[in-house]
């Protein structure tokens, strides 16, 4: 099957094809989506300053610990500013004629706001007073259950091996899969939030990739209302992350806290779930494995870095005879700092690795999967070289002020 755009060696042809996207297929409201995303960014950007002052007054401040990278007390609760941007942008989307039917015929956006409010409440309490792991986990399950109760759940699953194909999930399987993936992504984003700008940047990259994939679904299905929720959810999240990044990039003036990282995880889970639910094998064909697996690959992109870090940490600590959950300064970002990368470069390198997987999966709906895989392979080589360069040039007197 041919997708709407073909990869070509002619750069001008590819650019022209991408520009033609807005004219192909009914109901692809690119301008409205861009406006909604920009609104989320602006509200978040201007709300972050007041939230920073509020966090300082309430005592929601992260004081440096031995294993932390930051060296000065820094306010958190930045997730509140992001949530305000998201709520404002979703309200605007509900008033725009081109996006209104996404609210009338789907509960995706209202579900995200309600579940987001739950996770925001849990996160804010944790940012200020701290919560034990069990209480926090219960809050995450509650927020994920809100999504399921309001109709945001995985209904089909494509398995490309063994001739299985598309599986229609029963209610119990649908609930369990949705809860498991949602809580996993929420915790993955919470786990990776260890460097200035890292979680916000990963949220931005992955949300843009999901939005790109959702726009492709809208184009291919003539503006089917089922594909509005993932497009709106992802572009709103991308805008909120973009608006927060100027305050959070190294050296950060404010941290997003658990309220922010868990909110990003919840919305990414909701966006990928609403993107995956309506996809039909009849629409794309069994051989288009990349397109059918893209929602899962986008989930993998979010979880790739934190899960790799977590697995390495468990192996490292158990081999040393310590608890698998005992803290240390040997996380992936610590190692990248130690080999000679600056704080900013570590963040940018992780952006690159996640972006390769995220945009590689999302672009499968526009480009030939074989060409996409070839480009991804080349990008992986480039990312690998960029990661290892300090080992080749580093001397005993190597120094970078950003490491301080």
Swiss-Prot record:
Q: Where in the cell is it found?
A: Cell membrane
Q: Where is this site: Important in orienting the substrate?
A: 126-127
Residues the record annotates as the site (Could be required for catalysis) are 193, 196
- GO CC annotations, alphabetized: plasma membrane
> Where do the TM regions start and end?
33-53, 79-99, 105-125, 148-168, 175-195, 198-218, 225-245, 259-279, 295-315, 347-367, 372-392
**How does the record classify its membrane topology?**
Multi-pass membrane protein
Q: What is its EC number?
A: 2.7.8.35
Q: Which reaction does it catalyse?
A: trans,octa-cis-decaprenyl phosphate + UDP-N-acetyl-alpha-D-glucosamine = N-acetyl-alpha-D-glucosaminyl-1-diphospho-trans,octa-cis-decaprenol + UMP
Sorted alphabetically, the Gene Ontology BP terms of this entry are:
capsule polysaccharide biosynthetic process; cell wall macromolecule biosynthetic process; cell wall organization; lipopolysaccharide biosynthetic process
UniProt GO MF annotations: glycosyltransferase activity; magnesium ion binding; manganese ion binding; phosphotransferase activity, for other substituted phosphate groups
Question: Would you say which domain of life the source belongs to?
Answer: Bacteria
| InterPro entries in alphabetical order | Glycosyl_transferase_4
Q: Enumerate the cofactors the protein uses.
A: Mg(2+); Mn(2+)
Q: Which UniProt key words apply to this protein? A: Cell membrane, Cell wall biogenesis/degradation, Glycosyltransferase, Magnesium, Manganese, Membrane, Transferase, Transmembrane, Transmembrane helix
Name the enzyme group at the top EC level: transferase
Q: Does the keyword Transmembrane helix apply?
A: yes
User: Pfam family of this protein, just one?
Assistant: Glycos_transf_4
Per the record, the pathway is: Cell wall biogenesis; cell wall polysaccharide biosynthesis
What family does this belong to?
A: Belongs to the glycosyltransferase 4 family. WecA subfamily.
Q: What else is known?
A: Mycobacteria use decaprenyl phosphate (C50-P) as a lipid carrier in all known cell wall biosynthetic pathways, rather than the usual undecaprenyl phosphate (C55-P) usually used in Gram-negative bacteria.
Its job: Involved in the biosynthesis of the disaccharide D-N-acetylglucosamine-L-rhamnose which plays an important role in the mycobacterial cell wall as a linker connecting arabinogalactan and peptidoglycan via a phosphodiester linkage. Catalyzes the transfer of the N-acetylglucosamine-1-phosphate (GlcNAc-1P) moiety from UDP-GlcNAc onto the carrier lipid decaprenyl phosphate (C50-P), yielding GlcNAc-pyrophosphoryl-decaprenyl (GlcNAc-PP-C50).
Name listed for the protein in its UniProt record: Decaprenyl-phosphate N-acetylglucosaminephosphotransferase
Q: What taxonomic lineage is listed for the species of origin?
A: Bacteria, Bacillati, Actinomycetota, Actinomycetes, Mycobacteriales
